[in-house]
Design a protein with these regions (language model features):
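C-terminal segment of classical bacterial N-terminal signal peptides
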Residues: 22-30
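Basic/polar N-terminal segments that are highly enriched at the extreme N-terminus
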Residues: 1-6, 29-33
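Intrinsically disordered, low-complexity polar regions and short flexible loop motifs
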Residues: 31-232
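Bacterial N-terminal signal peptides that target proteins for export
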Residues: 3-16
């Protein structure tokens, strides 16, 4: 199996945060005291085109490309009907490739990821990940999400070192690891194997921050990559 070795878009900042917040804005009559949540969206389907994302019938995100992740947007806490269509399509005409009712609680931070495949038997699989790290002023926190639908369970290790995460299956997100600040080189191995199948380019981790690394795309089709993101 030969995953591509490029890092993809490190973080796709699409200028959509303002649009997302505006589309879900708290009505003026409600008032600023209402509780809010923070939400971002990741496109992890390697054979899917850019997509538009709707919530409760309003377009929130336009032309989100594969291997891109938005900034967090602050939205009113509550339940939303999330629908995803190919870029330029409408929810009335479709095709709607994801339709899910999601609840974003007061004070929460959430990443919503599209994973899986558009053409294959697995289909498109939405993933919902709570982003609630605990501050680590001296070091950093790092976790990993295995969102590559056709990859086996994996271990993650410093290059040439012992695994720090073991037997992580598809759809799983690890706990945060406490690590020292600074650059780190990591590799992905098949669970239980000493051989690397993918080397993550150097991550420069700054003290006091928390990060997620998302493995996305298709391992077999060569769209596998890892997208790092700051869990602000």
């Amino acid at each position: 199996m030969n995953p591509q070795t490029s890092f993809g878009r490190k973080v796709g900042l699409l200028g959509t945060t303002a649009a997302l917040a505006a589309a879900l804005a708290i009505p003026a009559a409600v008032g600023a005291q209402d509780e809010t949540a923070m939400v971002r969206v990741l496109h992890g389907v390697g054979d899917a085109p850019a997509v538009d994302v709707y919530a409760n019938g309003d377009e929130l995100i336009d032309a989100l490309a594969f291997a891109s992740i938005t900034d967090y947007a602050v939205v009113p806490a509550g339940t939303y009907l999330i629908q995803v269509v190919p870029d330029g399509a409408t929810i009335e005409e479709g095709p709607v490739v994801i339709e899910a009712e999601l609840e974003f609680g007061e004070g929460t931070k959430t990443t919503v990821a599209a994973t899986g495949t558009l053409a294959g038997e697995a289909g498109i699989i939405p993933q919902v990940v709570p982003d609630m790290p605990e501050p680590n002023a001296e070091g950093v926190q790092l976790r990993a999400s295995h969102f590559s639908f056709d990859a086996p369970a994996v271990d993650i290790a410093p290059v040439g070192g012992e695994p720090v995460l073991t037997d992580v299956p598809f759809g799983a997100t690890s706990d945060y690891l406490d690590l020292p600040a600074g650059p780190i080189d990591l590799e992905i191995r098949g669970a239980g194997s000493p051989d690397a199948v993918f080397t993550i380019p150097t991550l420069d981790l700054e003290a006091g921050n928390s990060y997620s690394a998302y493995a996305i795309g298709s391992f077999e089709e060569g769209t596998f990559t890892v997208i790092p993101a700051l869990d602000e």
